[in-house]
Amino acid sequence: MHLEAARVIFFLWIFLQVQGIKDLSIKIYGSEIKDIDNAPRTEATKNTAKTYKVSTMRRIFDLAKHRTKRSAFFPTGVKVCPQESMEQILASLQAYYRLRVCQEAVWEAYRIFLDRLPEPGEYQDWVSVCQQETFCLFDIGKNFSNSQEHLDLLQQRMKQRNFLERKDEVVTKETLGELGQTPGLQQTLPVSHPGPCLSLPMTTAQRNPQLHPSRTPRVPTRERKIEFTDAAEDALEQKVELSISLANQKFKSELDNSQSPYYLEVAAKSQLQMQKIFKKLPGFKEIHVSGFRPKKERDGTSSTEMQLTAIFKKGKAEAKSPASDPLSLDSNKIESEGDPRGTTEEEKQRELYPTASELRKLISRALEEDQSLDVGTIQFTDEIVGSLPSLDPDTQLVLPTLLTDITKDATLSPELPLGQPRLETVDRAGHSPPGASPTDGWSPPAMTSTSLSETLPFFTASSVFPQTDQSATDIMSIDQTVLIPRLTVPTDDYSAISPLVPEISHLPTSSEDWLSTSSQDTMEYLDGVDLTKTPTSSEGPRNSVGMFPAWIIFLENITPDPGLRYITTSAMTVAARGRELVVFFSLRVANVPFSTDLFNKSSLEYQALEQRFTQLLVPNLRSNLTGFKQLEILNFRNGSVIVNSKVRFAKSVPYNLTKAVRGVLEDFRSTAAQQLDLEIDSYSLDVEPADQADPCKFLACGEFAQCVRNEWTEEAECRCRSGTQALVLPIEDCEDIPGKGTPCRSLDQSKNQVYEPGVKKFQRQQDNKVTMKRKFELLTIGYEEFNYQDWEGN
């Protein structure tokens, strides 16, 4: 009994001890959470809490040991590789920090002081200077605030505010200031030179040049001493003076007085409206309204002609910089890497600012496309030598020296209607046609089948073109063939015209100048002349030699129209005269064998391969290139398989067209090699814009045919050589029929060698057209289903 009582007491004591320790642990842990900073702890409490924490950290550490080890990425975008040392990591972070700070500083300077986006070249210059610590950050802002562009911008804003607030007051000419001057800012403005920057300790990148190669500091090309002089302005700017007629705006007498409130109100509104149109043009700075004057239209009504002066930036040859490569504002690159497909220095300079002729084309196109203005005619002042205002509608221009610069190679044919210009081959080397001596006069037939009316439309803005020195003007380049449309000259007094043609002893030897300035300006106006609407007249012969319509001036310097030239910058590509952009490209597929059926566009193999490349290329071009319109597979050539194609785009695109197409094709080549089992030779990629490409290079003609290029339309076509004739017309649609030779055959072949009678051949052509139409409809339906499935899959 006594033993059992002792055992019970022993177990009870053990139970109480265990329970007390447990309560003590809970109390210590609770007090630690509540009073972790203020409550005093005993040594036992500290040891217990430490044991508890260590065990928790050990459990977390044990779990972390089972995770996969990977490289650390900083949220800034700098990747830290495991093999880098601590000094290299710090150097990379510091360099990236300096780059981002400089990018933001320069970007904000352009946005705040100049209110525009920077050009890639100047942006890179300033970022490089900032990274090299040539300027302190705040000195960059001081330089921008004292720049001429910023002061001109302030002057422009002040003028706009004065026009709106004080339009009811009479403002003197001295208050407004003369055009090109800055009132109140004529004195030389002191520019604060950069003070001594705080010398930072030498970083790891400076101690180790191999980690971060140093660059030579390039100070941006900016005026240190700003003076508003004509010389400095002419060196940095170019002015374009033009006048536009507003057909629906009647002229009021108040517009004659430049100090009247009505004049100031109209000028302010017109200036703001023109700024909205012109700000889209590259290099535009400002525009001013020079004045208004009345103009009498051809129908007798009166309209208003507004004179404008637009100021653009002008690129200089010495402003070229090796750092003019475009820089992405979100780029993480610390060092500039050269682009293996980069443009040359000349191309970079050409991409900065357009030339004077390109500006005129851009301005004309922008005004014509704007719907807010009813623009009648556009005339540039620098193109006018003499002005004949207020012409009577029935009065025609008298140009006594109109045909002074006609070359001997220009052939005038009286036998072709004006609506169908004939293509004539002309030798640029200066040789006379066979059977004609250099001194022979022009002796056309006595009667002409088509004549011109005396009331033909001519240019609204009249011009007088003086006779120019033949030796000082490059008319044509040598050793090239151009195509000239024949025209009918409406006169019977041929003896009077013949003495007007000067004798040309030589032609220019330059093969680079395609045209002279006068012909370039003239052809811009010919774009708006519709020769097919020319009326015919049966009136008698004319008495005056000079009574020719003004569009005949294109016979002066008969060089082909250069209107297809594209205006290309780093941020846009624009086709001149409102045409669509065209790019030719070719690529070679190495692992596809070539067969003779690919010469025949009607063969199933040709159509299948054409459909395959169309389905592969069109989605890539459409999704990656804004303004894409059409892809045309021109032909397949031997050499494994060489695919020649033509891509059509809109009139203007917001990127460099050639670079963008090449980039898309490079991506397509990589994708085709990985997913489609197509080995495209990277060295075979050839991308050429239509204004620089030779269309005959991408057009395959037959053995007895030759490629002929129309210099006006920039289109190429196959034509039979002399002594041959076409089997099927048009020749460009002919195919090599297996077993039946080439599309053209010699004329000396016997009639027994004719392949088919005329009736059967015509019937076969019609059957082929119907078959091709059905196949094309089936291919179109299949291609639409393919696009729909591809869209749903995405």
From Swiss-Prot:
Biological process (GO) annotations held by this record are:
visual perception
| Alphabetical list of Pfam families matching this protein | SEA (PF01390)
Q: List the disulfide bonds.
A: none
Location of motif Heparin- and hyaluronan-binding in this chain is 629-637
Keywords linked to the UniProt accession = Cell projection, Extracellular matrix, Glycoprotein, Heparin-binding, Hyaluronic acid, Receptor, Repeat, Secreted, Sialic acid, Signal
Where does this protein reside within or beyond the cell?
Answer: Cell projection, Cilium, Photoreceptor outer segment; Secreted, Extracellular space, Extracellular matrix, Interphotoreceptor matrix; Photoreceptor inner segment
Instruction: Please give the chief subcellular localization of this protein.
Output: other
Q: Which domain of life is it from?
A: Eukaryota
Q: Carbohydrate attachment sites?
A: T425, T439, S443, T448, T450, N624, N656
- GO terms for MF: chondroitin sulfate binding; heparin binding; hyaluronic acid binding
Alphabetized Gene3D superfamilies for the sequence: SEA domain
Q: Where is the composition biased (Polar residues)?
A: 202-213
Keyword Ribonucleoprotein carried by entry: no
Name it.
Interphotoreceptor matrix proteoglycan 1
Q: What is the lineage of its organism?
A: Eukaryota, Metazoa, Chordata, Craniata, Vertebrata
> Which gene holds the coding sequence for this protein?
IMPG1
